[in-house]
Each structure stands twice: as C-alpha cells, then as structure tokens.
C-alpha cells in the first residue's frame, strides 16, 4: 500500500506500508546426527513501512531522501537446512532494519552530449542479522547452521557517473 503526493513539479513525497507473512512447515532433525525428524510449522508476520521524497534544488539537481523499516524473512534453507551439510534453525528470527538513504543527482544535456552524476549515503541499522556459522556435531563432524548474530551497523556511500553521446553511445560506471 502506498500514497504519493506531488504538490509541485519540484518535489514529491510518498509513504508506504508492507506486510510480511511467512508460513512454513517441514521436517526438523531431532538428533545430532540428523537421523530422526519431527514435522514442525512456523508462522511469522511483520509490518514494514517507509517514506521517500525528492526535491529539485535547481534544474537538473535533485535531492532524494528515504527511510524504510524493512524485514528479511529467513529462507527455507536457513530454517530447515539441506539434509546434508547444513542444519536449519526453525526458531531463527527475521532480520529487521532501519534503512536511510540520501542521494544527490545531477543531469545535464548540451547538444548531443549528456552527463549524469549521482552520489549517495547509506545507513543500515540491522537487528537480528542472520549469520551462517559452523556447529560441531558428534563424531568429529561439523555442519553449517544459522544464528541471529545481533546488531550490525552499515554505513557507506556510492557514486555513479554516465556520459552519453546521441543515441548510440553511453558509458558509465559506479563505485
């Protein structure tokens, strides 16, 4: 569900909501050598939301700001394993994060030449980060499993540039 407001040609604003739902059922190993199984089910739901806005500071120069409360639901392999080298954890929680992005972009065309440059800042505050780890089993064997690691903070930036000539050449890159 989303709503977009455009009060002028220079700026717009949108808000949105997301409903995450996951129901799974399958066998879970009940012994350390993975020889005995029991059928297990799990039902998880969460609400995500966010807002985004753009504003043209000058013709061709645009600022973008967005925030999202997001979730990443565990995969089937993370919950149930692969019956070989990976053990699942049916109790693993979804990752949830607060994501913030701030971008500035500039575009200009002169004659047949066009230039586009964009730079952005990224901030992610992730809780219950799902991490793959190695667990020791009986008999000197080991297997991969998944755990909720805790809090992970990500800060970064990105830069991209593109040059175009007419309709037949476009060269760009990003970092």
Language-model segments: residues:
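Outer-membrane beta-barrel translocator domains and adjoining extracellular loop/strand segments
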Residues: 1, 25-34, 75-83, 129-138
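Hydrophobic, lipid-facing positions within transmembrane beta-strands of outer-membrane proteins
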Residues: 1, 47-51, 63, 88, ...
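Transmembrane beta-barrel domains of bacterial outer-membrane proteins
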Residues: 1-5, 155-166, 174
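Signature of Gram-negative outer-membrane beta-barrel scaffolds
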Residues: 1-58, 73
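Extracellular loop and loop/strand-boundary signature of outer-membrane beta-barrel proteins
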Residues: 1-2, 30-40, 84-92, 142-148, ...
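Transmembrane beta-strands of outer-membrane beta-barrel pores
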Residues: 5, 19-25, 67-73, 80-82, ...
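Transmembrane beta-strands of outer-membrane beta-barrel proteins
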Residues: 13-15, 49, 63-65, 115-119, ...
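Membrane-embedded beta-barrel scaffold of Gram-negative outer-membrane proteins
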Residues: 56, 62-68, 94-155, 164
């Amino acid at each position: 569900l989303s709503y977009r407001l455009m009060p002028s040609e220079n700026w717009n604003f949108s808000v949105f909501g997301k409903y995450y739902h996951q129901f799974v059922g399958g066998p879970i190993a009940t012994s350390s050598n993975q020889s005995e199984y029991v059928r297990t089910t799990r039902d998880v739901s969460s609400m995500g939301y966010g807002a985004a806005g753009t504003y043209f500071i000058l013709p061709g120069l645009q600022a973008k700001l967005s925030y999202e409360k997001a979730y990443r639901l565990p995969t089937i392999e993370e919950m149930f394993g692969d019956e070989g080298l990976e053990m699942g954890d049916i109790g693993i929680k979804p990752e949830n994060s607060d994501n913030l992005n701030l971008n500035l972009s500039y575009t200009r065309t002169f004659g047949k030449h066009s230039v586009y440059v964009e730079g952005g800042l990224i901030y992610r505050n992730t809780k219950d980060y799902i991490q793959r780890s190695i667990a020791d089993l009986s008999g000197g064997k080991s297997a991969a499993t998944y755990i909720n690691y805790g809090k992970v903070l990500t800060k970064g930036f990105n830069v991209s540039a593109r040059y175009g000539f007419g309709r037949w050449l476009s060269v760009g890159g990003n970092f």
